[in-house]
Amino acid sequence: RTLSTVANGSVDLVVTSPPYPMIEMWDSLFTALNPDIADSLQRNDGYQAFELMNRELDTIWEEIERVVKENGFVCINIGDATRKIGNQFQLYSNHSRITSKFVSLGFQPLPIVLWKKTTNAPNKFMGSGMLPAGAYITLEHEYILVFRKGGKREFTTPDQRSIRNQSAYFWEERNIWFSDTWTLKGVKQTTHGESVRERNAAYTFELPYRLINMYSVKGDTILDPFLGTGTTTFAAIASERNSIGIEYDKNFSSIISEGLKNLEKKVNGSITRRLEEHIAFCSKYQREKG
């Protein structure tokens, strides 16, 4: 619940996805951290439960303020929650609560990304079906919040500028990555076995890979304080960055170790695909534009 092993001002970029407050599959984790949360849910006090869950995350956000370098970035994937507590159904806006906390810590909120998750489930709509004034809008996106600590990062020495140039991405990648809407296939939040808690906030490899290449340079240090299955670390390795990963549940260690064993093939495949897509783009551009 703290980042005591991480030195002050040692992290260039945080990329993470925490447990989502007010999503039922995370209740057991939050109530284990603070039994008052269970009491709030039993009393049907949704607002209090929501606030107490977010206060548990606040302890990590406060630590992040300590470990992130001046001019460093924080990227957080988070979803809002809809839930019926007692007889009251409503939205619990996690992204707003987290943004408020980071602003209070002195971070600058930057433009966000909406991660649109496609779903074709015929029963995805909530409420009274075809009858008006009783149905609810279905949430089909999550947020990628972006914060900066202090002002713009400067690259003043020849070595710094050289590393920055070596870390450049392709023109067409910039156009996609810096759009405010991403459509990426998500990773189902379920167990990898009965020995592992029956949920994790795993996101697709492409999500941290993009963010790491957007907001850091080669040799930087990337932190994920909610490491889960290790995706952020894998993306950092693929991007030639250093990685610090911290995970509360020790049962994930075997999953992370297995992922590291198979990482070379995954990384090489990802880089090869990226180059092939760039070559295809250049060929198409040359045919169409001359």
Region locations from a protein language model:
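S-adenosyl-L-methionine-dependent nucleic acid methyltransferase catalytic domains
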Residues: 1-135, 139, 169-290
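Surface-exposed flexible segments
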Residues: 9, 156-162
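Active-site-adjacent helix-turn-beta-strand microarchitecture at beta-sheet edges
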Residues: 160-171
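Proline-centered turn/helix-capping motifs that create local helix->coil transitions or kinks
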Residues: 152-158, 174-177
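Conserved beta strand-loop-helix elements of the APE1-like EEP
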Residues: 136-152
